[in-house]
């Protein structure tokens, strides 16, 4: 690769790349892919600025031949390729003369025509992924980002590509040539894959024998043994040294390491605003099932047959009416959609043979509810270059929402036991090794604790719905297919039971990419009156569709039955993960196993049996405003499972960000509790990173409020 770079790139570029790598302490003999990447990036920056000038009238012009006259000024200032001190000097002088805002990171170019700094990216991956990484790092509206890929794709801020078509084509052609040259030498694959570096963690192992001798031989000068060197590293006082290094980087960096004390952290600031609303793909605690026991009807197991059989168990249907409208939707359309489902189910029943699947008639109400013909038409860019006001959509900032009590109630319900079993105990073969015996014993204990848990019902419901929807999306792309929402369980007496929660109607689903969206309308039965917590049901139109007789302590009472209707959407990748929800069982089992392992290592014997059978012992299950909550091992299993299930049901970028950033603060607090005297710099920045994820997501807001309870008790 090094030979290729020296042949392929201009010697001046190679020399600059060597300097850059030296400045960062990297060895170009080892980091050959990085060497190639730096040269490529430098060349793209130079090509970007080549031939572009500004004339006396302040217009941008292109001059390719001969010497430009003295009155022309270069349009771009090249910052990339200078050493850091010089680069910051150039940036500071540009900011002073033009009034531009000083960037946090060194940009690559400055554009005197558009008066903005430019960050150039060259990626071997998807342009949009790299663009987002750059944007997240820079976090500045002012710096313009322009990404090129080796496949000829590009992406720029607000689709503003700065340069003319021909100049950009020159860059793309050059990148394509580099790629082909690398490929012909067998270097491309390694170069392409090297863009994402994986972090490695070195454990502190005891080193003996030959490795020990090698370690002693490879110490820095002035250290006699590995122990000496380790003692020096462990006792190293970082403040002055790190500050010195950082001050060479940027004039604004200040990293005095502050001690982190009990009084240091503050609670997370949760947003104010209207209460957050339900956003799961199906109802959770509010769902109502129409069930048949010991199903043995003809076509048992075919969803549509099962659904019709379940529907026949209920006799309290009545003329539906809207009791809680959807603020922004056309509510009569939701009402008509339900009436259409009832009518078309009735039509099926009148047929001699019930079909296996049902495609709904494409009525105006369903077209509206499924967003048919609502997507803007895609037009080829070349066909509309001359349109004056062509621009990307403006997207509004999401509205801040406050934490509402319903999400804690949802979580509590998910931890409870139902009176049915939702998973079977695996029929496991004979154990061969002792370790298998322990593993299957743990699995059986765990399964018996969670098989009746409501979170397990949500798993099976989620797996069923996502599988059915993904199948229908591939098999009937153009059809509005009716998909019953079904689950299966066993009663206390071991009898099989089939449950119907409601229906989904799928919209058009030509899903080429993982993230392409399929719209669907969900219609779900419930006994919950939406008027009790209207804010929870903001995205729903709720109909009253019947009266149900409920057995209660005072005999039979009649309760209104509701139908929760909403338009929703999902994608191939979300459905794929939804189908994998059983993994939540595995994740929570592994967490329980690590607790058992910790106990076992203290007692020096396997504690599985005692762990599950000692009913008097309690274990911590979480924090609440009252303090650390403790409970039985069964409740611990169910709580861990519910957390894992909610992470899946309420998966979102806000949750990803909150989990990653709050974990850093959690580790610092735990280090303080373990008397490890942690130090931090830019704690304010960490709080900012955590709090920018607290927007409107109910599960993230609940986790943040739990985190605050943890902070209070951990530091009191």
Swiss-Prot record:
Mn(2+) 1 binds at residues 41, 108, 119-120. It comes from the Viruses. Binds 2 manganese ions per subunit. Its EC number is 3.1.-.-. A motif (Nuclear localization signal 1 (NLS1)) lies at residues 124-139. Its main location: host cell. Its cofactor is Mn(2+). Mn(2+) 2 binds at residues 80, 108. InterPro entries: INFV_PA (IPR037534), PA/PA-X (IPR001009), PA/PA-X_sf (IPR038372). A motif (Nuclear localization signal 2 (NLS2)) lies at residues 184-247. GO terms for biological process: cap snatching; DNA-templated transcription; symbiont-mediated suppression of host gene expression; symbiont-mediated suppression of host mRNA transcription via inhibition of RNA polymerase II activity; viral RNA genome replication; viral translational frameshifting. Keywords: Cap snatching, Endonuclease, Eukaryotic host gene expression shutoff by virus, Eukaryotic host transcription shutoff by virus, Host cytoplasm, Host gene expression shutoff by virus, Host nucleus, Host-virus interaction, Hydrolase, Inhibition of host RNA polymerase II by virus, Manganese, Metal-binding, Nuclease, Phosphoprotein. GO terms for molecular function: endonuclease activity; metal ion binding; RNA binding. It is found in: Host cytoplasm; Host nucleus. One of its GO terms (cellular component) is host cell cytoplasm. It holds the Pfam family Flu_PA. Phosphorylated on serines and threonines by host kinases, including human casein kinase II. Belongs to the influenza viruses PA family. Influenza RNA polymerase is composed of three subunits: PB1, PB2 and PA. Interacts (via C-terminus) with PB1 (via N-terminus). Plays an essential role in viral RNA transcription and replication by forming the heterotrimeric polymerase complex together with PB1 and PB2 subunits. The complex transcribes viral mRNAs by using a unique mechanism called cap-snatching. It consists in the hijacking and cleavage of host capped pre-mRNAs. These short capped RNAs are then used as primers for viral mRNAs. The PB2 subunit is responsible for the binding of the 5' cap of cellular pre-mRNAs which are subsequently cleaved after 10-13 nucleotides by the PA subunit that carries the endonuclease activity. HAMAP family: INFV_PA. This is Polymerase acidic protein. It comes from Influenza A virus (strain A/X-31 H3N2).
């Amino acid at each position: 690769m090094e030979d290729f770079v020296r042949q392929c790139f201009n010697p001046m570029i190679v020399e600059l790349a060597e300097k850059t790598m030296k400045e960062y302490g990297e060895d170009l003999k080892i980091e050959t892919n990085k060497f190639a990447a730096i040269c490529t990036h430098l060349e793209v920056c130079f090509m970007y600025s080549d031939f572009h000038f500004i004339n006396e009238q302040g217009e941008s012009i292109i001059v390719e031949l001969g010497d430009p006259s003295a009155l022309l000024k270069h349009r771009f200032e090249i910052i990339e390729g200078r050493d850091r001190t010089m680069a910051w000097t150039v940036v500071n002088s540009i900011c002073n003369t033009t009034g531009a805002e000083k960037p946090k990171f060194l940009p690559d170019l400055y554009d005197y025509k558009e008066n903005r700094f430019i960050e150039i990216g060259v990626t071997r991956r998807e342009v949009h992924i790299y663009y987002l990484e750059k944007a997240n790092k820079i976090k500045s509206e002012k710096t313009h980002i322009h990404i090129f890929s080796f496949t000829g794709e590009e992406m720029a801020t607000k689709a503003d590509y700065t340069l003319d078509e021909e100049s950009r084509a020159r860059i793309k052609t050059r990148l394509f040539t580099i790629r082909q040259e690398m490929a012909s030498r067998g270097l491309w694959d390694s170069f392409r894959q090297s863009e994402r570096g994986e972090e490695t963690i070195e454990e502190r192992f005891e080193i003996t024998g030959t490795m020990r001798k090698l370690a002693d031989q490879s110490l820095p000068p002035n250290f006699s043994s590995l122990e000496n060197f380790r003692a020096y590293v462990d006792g190293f006082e970082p403040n002055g040294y790190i500050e010195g290094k950082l001050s060479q980087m940027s004039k604004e960096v200040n990293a005095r390491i502050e001690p982190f004390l009990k009084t240091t952290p503050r609670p997370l600031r949760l947003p104010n605003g209207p209460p957050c609303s339900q956003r799961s793909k199906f109802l959770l605690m509010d769902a109502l099932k129409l069930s048949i026991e010991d199903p043995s009807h003809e076509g048992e197991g075919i969803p549509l047959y099962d659904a019709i059989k379940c529907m026949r168990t209920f006799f309290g249907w009545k003329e539906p009416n809207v009791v809680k409208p959807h603020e922004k939707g056309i509510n009569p359309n939701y009402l008509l959609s339900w009436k259409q489902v009832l009518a078309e189910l009735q039509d099926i029943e009148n047929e001699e043979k019930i079909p296996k699947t049902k495609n709904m008639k494409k009525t105006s109400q369903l077209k509206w509810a499924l967003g048919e013909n609502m997507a803007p038409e895609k037009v080829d860019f070349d066909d509309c270059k001359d349109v004056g006001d062509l621009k990307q959509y403006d997207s509004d900032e999401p509205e801040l929402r406050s934490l509402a009590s319903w999400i804690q109630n949802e979580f509590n319900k998910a931890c409870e036991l139902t009176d049915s079993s939702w998973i079977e105990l695996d029929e496991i073969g004979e154990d061969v090794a002792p370790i298998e015996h322990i593993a299957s014993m743990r699995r059986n204990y765990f399964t018996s604790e969670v098989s009746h848990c409501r979170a397990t019902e949500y798993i099976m419901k989620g797996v069923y719905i996502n599988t059915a929807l993904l199948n229908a999306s591939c098999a009937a792309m153009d059809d509005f297919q009716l998909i019953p929402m079904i689950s299966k369980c066993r009663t206390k007496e071991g009898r099989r039971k089939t449950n119907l929660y409601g229906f989904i109607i799928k919209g058009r689903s030509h899903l080429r990419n993982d993230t392409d969206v399929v719209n669907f309308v969900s219609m779900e039965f419930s006994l919950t009156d939406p008027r009790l917590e209207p804010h929870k049901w903001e995205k729903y139109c709720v109909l009253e569709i019947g009266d149900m007789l409920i057995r209660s302590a005072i005999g039979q009472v009649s309760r209104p039955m509701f139908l929760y209707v909403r338009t929703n959407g999902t994608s191939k990748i979300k459905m794929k993960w939804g189908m994998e929800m059983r993994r939540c069982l595995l994740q929570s089992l592994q967490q329980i196993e690590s607790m058992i392992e910790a106990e076992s290592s203290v007692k020096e014997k396997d504690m599985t049996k005692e762990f599950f059978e000692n009913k008097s012992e309690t274990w911590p299950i979480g924090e609440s405003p009252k303090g650390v909550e403790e409970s039985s091992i069964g409740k611990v299993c169910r709580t861990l499972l519910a957390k894992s299930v909610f992470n899946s049901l309420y998966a979102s970028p806000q949750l990803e960000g909150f989990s990653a950033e709050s974990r850093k603060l959690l580790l610092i607090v735990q280090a303080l509790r373990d008397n490890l005297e942690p130090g931090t710099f830019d704690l304010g920045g960490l709080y900012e990173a955590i709090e920018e994820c607290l927007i409107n997501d109910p599960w993230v807001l609940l986790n943040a409020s739990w985190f605050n309870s943890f902070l209070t008790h951990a530091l009191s």
